[in-house]
């Protein structure tokens, strides 16, 4: 609970407002061509919570609500909106906020007992970006090695 209002606002601004601005930027072009794919990134942490990351988990749950609401709003324009929920990913970018013990616990909680890397997400994102997902919208695909099942 030791999160400042400023830190809270910053995380929500990046993770929630950022989606709004990106979607607003591409919408006119997608509407004009009556086709488009918006793919948002959530987190599997929304299924089980994550202590000391209240602002992050809240913002990533917001991604799901945004995705579903926007899917309903722009579907008539031929635009699909979906989200991916990765688990704790060994990308190098989160080394400062995720100590080695946290990665070890993430691996232990998975059915697939190894680290998750950015490359583990590319197949899912490519599927969502392809014509193979043209009749799929408002969905969340969980890619975390089986740590969270819903």
Language-model segments: what does each one mean?
Residues 23, 59, 67:
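Active-site helix of classical SDR
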Residues 43:
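Residue(s) in the substrate-gating loop at a strand-loop-helix junction
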Residues 110-121, 132:
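A conserved structural motif in NAD(P)-dependent oxidoreductases
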Residues 48, 125-126, 137-150:
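Short C-terminal tail/terminal secondary-structure segment
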Residues 28, 72-76, 134:
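Alpha-helical segment proximal to the catalytic Tyr-Lys
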Residues 3, 49-57, 69:
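Active-site loop-to-helix junction immediately N-terminal to the catalytic Tyr of the SDR YXXXK motif
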Residues 4-9, 94, 106:
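Substrate-binding pocket helix/loop in short-chain dehydrogenase/reductase
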């Amino acid at each position: 609970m030791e999160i400042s209002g400023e830190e809270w606002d910053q995380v929500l601004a990046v993770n929630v407002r950022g989606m709004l601005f990106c979607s607003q930027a591409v919408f006119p072009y997608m509407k004009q061509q009556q086709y488009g794919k918006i793919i948002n990134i959530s987190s599997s942490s929304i299924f089980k919570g994550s202590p000391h990351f209240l602002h992050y988990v809240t913002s990533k749950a917001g991604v799901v609500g945004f995705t579903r609401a926007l899917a309903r709003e722009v579907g008539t324009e031929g635009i699909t909106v979906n989200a991916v929920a990765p688990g704790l990913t060994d990308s190098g970018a989160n080394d400062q906020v995720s100590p080695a013990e946290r990665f070890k616990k993430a691996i232990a909680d998975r059915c697939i007992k190894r680290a998750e890397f950015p490359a583990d997400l590319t197949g899912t994102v490519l599927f969502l970006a392809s014509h193979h997902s043209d009749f799929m919208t408002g969905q969340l695909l969980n890619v975390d090695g089986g740590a969270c099942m819903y």
